[in-house]
Amino acid sequence: MNSSSPISIDLIAEILSRVPSKSVARFRCVSKPWASMIRRPYFTELFLTRSSPKPCILFATVADGVWSFFSLPQYPYEKSSSASVAASAKFHVKFPPNNMRIGHNSDRRYFSYGYTSGLIYLYGDSSDDRSVICNPYTGEYAILPYLQRYRKTYSFLVFEPIEKQFKILFMAYLSGDRDHKILTVGTGNMKWRTIRCSLRYEIVSEGVSINGVLYYLGETSAWDNKDYDLKYDYAIVCFDIRSEKFIFFEIERFCRLINYKGKLAVIYFEDDVNYQSCLYRKKNYVEPDAINKLNVWVLEDVEKQEW
């Protein structure tokens, strides 16, 4: 009688989630089931949770198109302690491999990188650049299907927490009814699909993803959105990652979107400060004697638009 039994894949995942990232990268070569397990979003989440006893800050440096990824322990703030804490950064991996070009535009308005749930998205805005998804801990990556671009583009890496799927939302400028595309990462044959968005706008903010919904700010003043009775020049775009549907609601001024305790919040200055010019033109438009007030509004209900 054979008393031995195979180790379950869940137990293997539990064990591997506690080993160093370089070892995880090598374990992909053990077998196809192991390689498949390590690629799953579930394992990425588990590894980020179990591999370190303390929360970590992930950061990267870029030199000559090569990204170097590091992590740093995040120590809790102690108000009563005056002693400084010294910590050394842990190097993980360099990316991309040799002979692969990834464009990196230094202008934040082109959104040339994104991060969510343990994966990093890198893309360039020219036709020669390759778009990739990278695991900064193991160095594993996937090259995304080519998408023809002849206009300025925007895209976001998002994570759908129920089905645990990574998706990429892509938009071309000027954004029209058929200028939005979606790709589900990790499927056997990754393909871009066209999704419809009836509102025309230009993206003027970074994206904020909260509980399966992606939020970003759109400027609508340059287009005649005749199907909408718009009173203001800006709208917050809400993209449901699971259903792949858009909803919109107007906002009377330019603002910055943030995640505030698990809810969407907007912040903006009043009076003498042109915040949009300061943030996106990278110039100091603030007069020395400027009077301003910082406003913070938290969205309590998306459907009712209650703040």
Swiss-Prot record:
<protein>
    <recommendedName>
        <fullName>F-box protein At2g23160</fullName>
    </recommendedName>
</protein>
<dbReference type="InterPro" id="IPR036047">
    <property type="entry name" value="F-box-like_dom_sf"/>
</dbReference>
<dbReference type="InterPro" id="IPR017451">
    <property type="entry name" value="F-box-assoc_interact_dom"/>
</dbReference>
<dbReference type="InterPro" id="IPR013187">
    <property type="entry name" value="F-box-assoc_dom_typ3"/>
</dbReference>
<dbReference type="Pfam" id="PF08268">
    <property type="entry name" value="FBA_3"/>
</dbReference>
<feature type="domain" description="F-box">
    <location>
        <begin position="2"/>
        <end position="49"/>
    </location>
</feature>
<dbReference type="InterPro" id="IPR001810">
    <property type="entry name" value="F-box_dom"/>
</dbReference>
<dbReference type="Pfam" id="PF00646">
    <property type="entry name" value="F-box"/>
</dbReference>
